[in-house]
């Protein structure tokens, strides 16, 4: 979608098939992720994840409920996931070890001057977006 610059993903860090630890992968036939992908560049990304999500574990690892080939769907740690996206979009520094700012229960990890942002929503699960204040979301969209 060439006309879309801002992307928002809610409770959806990379899964273990989309990134193998080295490369992004394209979904193929029968959900096989074998072809190396080059994700979009020149875009802005906001990811929102809850620390208490039983379906998509914040710290990575297999979902307790989402099936996948060979068992349960594995996920990449949410903070690692946004770091991988930031590197793909042009970030050359180290992974952030702490939040860039804190807004209540939300820790904000910001890369590339706010073009790649992760909201770590503490004490929330798969409903993490419900904890967002409209102003915090608009702040990302306005930049």
Identify the function of each model-found stretch.
Residues 4-5, 138:
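Hydrophobic core segments within long, regular secondary-structure runs in both alpha-
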């Amino acid at each position: 979608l060439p006309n879309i610059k801002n992307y928002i993903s809610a409770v959806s860090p990379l899964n273990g098939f989309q990134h193998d630890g080295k490369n992004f992968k394209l979904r193929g036939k029968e959900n096989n992720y074998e072809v190396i992908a080059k994700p979009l560049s020149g875009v802005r990304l906001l990811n929102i994840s809850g620390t208490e999500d039983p379906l998509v574990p914040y710290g990575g690892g297999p979902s307790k409920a989402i099936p996948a080939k060979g068992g349960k769907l594995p996920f990449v740690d949410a903070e690692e996931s946004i770091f991988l996206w930031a590197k793909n979009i042009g970030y050359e520094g180290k992974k952030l070890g702490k939040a860039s700012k804190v807004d209540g229960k939300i820790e904000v990890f910001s890369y590339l001057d706010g073009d790649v942002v992760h909201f770590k929503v503490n004490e929330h699960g798969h409903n993490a977006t419900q904890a967002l204040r409209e102003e915090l979301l608009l702040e990302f969209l306005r930049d």
